[in-house]
Amino acid sequence: MYRTADHKPKLALFSLFVVFATTFLLYAGGFTTSIGAGMAFPDWPLSNGSLNPEGWLEDQAMLAEHSHRLLGASIGLLTLCLAVWTWKKDSRKWMRMLALASLVTVVMQGLLGGFRVLFNNLQFAMIHACLAQVYLCILVSIAAAQSAWWRRPILVGIGESAWWRRTSMRANDGMTPNRVKSLGLILCSLIFTQLIVGAIMRHSGAGLAIPTFPLTPEGDLIPNNWTFPIAIHFAHRAIAVIISLVYLCWAIRIIWNESIDPRIKCLGFLGIILIFTQITLGALIILTYRSPIPTTFHVFLGAYLFALTWLITFFQFKDEVVPIEPY
């Protein structure tokens, strides 16, 4: 086995744990919105004036919202630990800035969630939903940069010189790391735009504005009548088509390129799976008249598609050659 001189396994493992724990928070938040439980309690930060409100385990709306709050507080504490640990043990300035950004973002998330309740304002809920995606990507960036993989993207000649060579990532079809990065940034922008549109659609109650799939009730691709709910819903579908086509082209070129790290190829293949899963879930939302389970998973996997795309892109920013040493 090999490792880099600066690799800190415990910190790397903890950063992965925070990403894993955030998975539950994202699902809880998505489910809370899916069942319309965002205002299950009229107060904040307490719930009905208590940390353990009466009857919250028996009422679905109260259970969803209070669980979301408890998970949010727990993730906040984990993020604080991660930020402090990173500042103490990691000398890279940009890593410290990422750790600080994660802490600032999670505090902002908590405040936005509170403002959504105190002011009963869906605009805060929309911003809260979008910032959650940014927070997840920051955590993924920290976890990636703490990994041994970050320091040596491609291993050449295990048992020989054992050096990681970024130059070997140059593709014979022009799919260089810079090209992967550029197209990845474009895709991240498209997906984040889609997440914003989805949040607006979701919180404005337009999830069934076009109640049939894939065509409109009139049997057309484009609606005959236009209102804001129909327009935002159609925009969500149209952007999904664009993202799917661009993503497939990007990921397939990565997978077919022999000189790209096999692990990056695996991530690209996983992205393709998520794309088709998202299309299926989007259809199920319509066909089940917005059942909470497919709706929540559609939101949840959308966040991880964004994070996965960013992860592939983020790895292309690392261009140092780092030697490794045996344990």
How would you describe each model-predicted region?
Residues 1-157, 162-164, 168-327:
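Polytopic transmembrane helical bundles with strong interfacial aromatic enrichment
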